[in-house]
């Protein structure tokens, strides 16, 4: 970045493919909304069944629980959010936030870089980049698992968030399926009816995000199992961090 001669900079992962009009669209949005750091979620290409299950969970977890209006009207660090695959910033904002040097110990720049900007009193935003870029993050089942684990501690797999998020995710997306099965086995009509409502409401965010971000219906159908697996991986990451163990990612481990 130090050698760049322009005032607007783009940080993009090597596996992200941009559409011809992507940069102009992002720059126009950034200028129109006076955003210091703009992030976009590229279209996530998923081929394997585990990719279809787990990759779209980032839309459900991040955007499903993020109050977007409040995030856009505030610079509080608590509302920091982004996608590390694609960032657009301006030189002065990047310098004021401390550059990537401020987050050099982190592998979750999608969260940490927006937080650094907000700590400096700057505005950040995250938008849907489905029509602007595409990316396939993982190419194997093992890669998906490692990818989820590597960012987990800086996301929700920490002492402050793991319990409430486990209750929210399991209670909203897994428990209604369990109670539906039990109500069918016990022939309890009203419990079954209430459970069906719970299942629909629990799957609705996944369905809406699948439509918005053009994700597979396969992930929607198996959303309860995907959520259960996702939460289990968060707890694995939580225990691993407590034991001082790190996850290797593309030849690197945490320091």
Model-derived regions, located:
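Long helical/loop segments within the catalytic core of UDP-sugar-dependent glycosyltransferases
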Residues: 1-5, 25-96, 101, 152, ...
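Short aromatic/hydrophobic "clamp" motif used to bind/position activated sugar donors
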Residues: 9
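Thr-Gly-centered strand-to-loop micro-motif
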Residues: 12-13, 40
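Acidic donor-binding/catalytic loop of UDP-sugar-dependent glycosyltransferases
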Residues: 14-29
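Short aromatic/basic micro-patch
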Residues: 17, 88, 107
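Catalytic donor/gating beta->alpha subdomain of glycosyltransferases that bind UDP-sugars
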Residues: 30-33, 37-64, 92-95, 100-162, ...
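Membrane-embedded multi-pass helical conduit in multi-pass membrane proteins
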Residues: 163-165, 169-244
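Structural motif
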Residues: 242, 249-250
């Amino acid at each position: 970045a130090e050698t760049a001669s322009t005032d607007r900079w783009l940080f993009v992962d090597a596996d992200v493919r941009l559409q011809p009009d992507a940069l102009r669209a992002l720059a126009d949005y950034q200028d129109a909304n006076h955003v210091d750091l703009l992030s976009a979620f590229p279209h996530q290409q998923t081929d394997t069944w585990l990719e279809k299950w787990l990759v779209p969970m980032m839309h459900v977890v991040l955007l499903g629980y993020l109050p977007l209006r409040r995030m856009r009207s505030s610079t509080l660090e608590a509302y920091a959010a982004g996608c590390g695959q694609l960032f657009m910033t301006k030189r002065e904002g990047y310098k004021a936030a401390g550059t990537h040097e401020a987050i050099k110990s982190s592998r979750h720049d999608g969260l940490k870089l927006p937080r650094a900007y907000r700590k400096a009193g700057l505005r950040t935003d995250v938008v849907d980049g489905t029509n602007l870029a595409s990316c396939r993050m993982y190419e194997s089942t093992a890669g998906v698992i490692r990818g989820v684990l590597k960012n987990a501690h800086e996301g929700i797999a920490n002492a402050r968030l793991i319990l409430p998020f486990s209750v929210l995710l399991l209670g909203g997306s897994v428990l209604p399926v369990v109670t539906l099965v039990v109500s069918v086995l016990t022939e309890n009509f009203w419990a079954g009816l209430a459970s069906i409502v719970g299942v629909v409401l629990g799957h609705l965010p996944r369905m809406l995000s699948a439509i918005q971000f053009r994700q597979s219906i396969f992930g929607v159908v198996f959303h309860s199992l995907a959520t259960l697996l996702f939460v289990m991986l968060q707890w694995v990451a939580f225990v691993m961090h407590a034991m001082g163990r790190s996850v290797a990612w593309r030849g690197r481990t945490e320091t």
